[in-house]
Amino acid sequence: MNDPIQDHLRLLNRRSFLSTAGLGVGGVALAGLLSREAQAANTVHKPLAGYPHFAPKAKRIIYLHMNGAPSQLDLWDYKPQLEAHFDKDLPESIRNGQRITTMTSGQARFPVAPSQFKFAQHGKSGRWISELLPHTAKVVDMLAVMKSVSTTAINHDPACTFAMTGNEIPGKPSIGSWISYGLGSESDDLPSFVVLTPKSAGGQALFTRMWSSGFLPTRHTGVALRSGGDPVLYVQNPPGVQPGDRRITLDALAQLNAAGHRELGDPETLTRTAQYEMAFRMQAS
């Protein structure tokens, strides 16, 4: 015989459960523990919060982009055949019609040149590592080296854009934005994706598209920590502005943004409000 109560419990979905649990004092605590899962299903009210719709395996990722580093041929990509072809002209089959850079366009010929540094095998994997990386060679078995990634870009900027977004043409989400989208955030008070840029000038240009969210929601855009002044914008109050005044200002902005969202329906309006609120919580913590 069917039990209608048990049938009802089996059909009870998560959202209905949270609504029902919220009626009791004990349910309030439980609803708080499960609120992040509910936020993952609907992030309109808290655009910066929530877990993804699946359980991520990684907890955090640190991505180091060494723009302008030495050639991989001098570090870990051992090419012994280059020595056998030393000073021979680069075969046309290698170039395959690829245009050359302005730095080499004036050359009369394009000779093959091997690395000037010695290579040796290291670790149980037998990975070839250059003498330039003695410390890296000691932990080579802990590293995963990919040699299959390539691009047709011959200049730094489009190649860097490709490395960070998977496309030479700007506008796609950066790798950090995809990670933020995939892993979510464990804290409402900290951004899920931050960017550290070098302080020194005169190096390769860095553009915000390298940590942009592209077509993903802007809550996944990287928060760039500045090397001068306030590391994060809006965390410090302007001179003469008290915390209470700041709170009043944010409340007024939230009301204006909410009115704009009701009229236009643009979710980025609420995301901007959430960004200001996060900065305020970082300031108050």
Q: Could you say what each language-model-derived stretch is?
A:
Residues 1-285:
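Ligand-binding pockets and gating/stacking loops
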